């Protein structure tokens, strides 16, 4: 989840596509980690998200609401924070390849 946070930040900074899974958009353990906001997401860099809505740590429905205006979001009911179905990310990789 924190890896996805950094993937979004670095994707924008270096103009690179990204695929994220169950991201933490508002890390709260350090003050110098600002929340991901519209400024971080509103651009033309291809980004895709995979969300398992059963995440027991983060509210993925709220995350989905925040992300779906800016990127393709694939969500599944159930799952958990460590990802029950990581193989589904392979489909997103193939979709991302279509951009290039």
Language-model segment annotations:
Residues 55-62, 84:
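Conserved alpha/beta-hydrolase "acid-adjacent" motif
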Residues 79-89:
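Catalytic histidine-centered segment of alpha/beta-hydrolase-like enzymes
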Residues 10-11:
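Aromatic pocket-lining residues of Rossmann-like dinucleotide-binding sites
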Residues 42-44, 48-55:
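Short beta-strand/loop motif that positions the catalytic acidic residue
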Residues 1-7:
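Gly/Ala-rich beta-loop-alpha elbow adjacent to hydrolase catalytic centers
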Residues 23-44, 87-90:
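Flexible "cap/lid" loop of the alpha/beta hydrolase fold
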Residues 16-29, 52:
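Active-site nucleophile loop of the alpha/beta-hydrolase fold
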Residues 53-56, 77-80:
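Acidic beta-to-alpha connecting loop that harbors the catalytic carboxylate
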């Amino acid at each position: 989840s924190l890896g996805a946070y950094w993937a979004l930040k670095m994707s924008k900074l270096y103009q690179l596509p990204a695929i994220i899974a169950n991201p933490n958009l508002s890390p709260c353990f350090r003050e110098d980690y600002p929340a991901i906001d519209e400024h971080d997401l509103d651009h033309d860099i291809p980004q895709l998200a995979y969300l398992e809505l059963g995440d027991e740590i983060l509210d993925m429905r709220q995350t989905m609401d925040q992300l779906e205006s800016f990127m393709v979001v694939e969500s599944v009911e159930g799952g958990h924070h460590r990802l029950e179905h990581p193989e589904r990310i392979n489909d997103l990789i193939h979709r991302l390849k279509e951009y290039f």
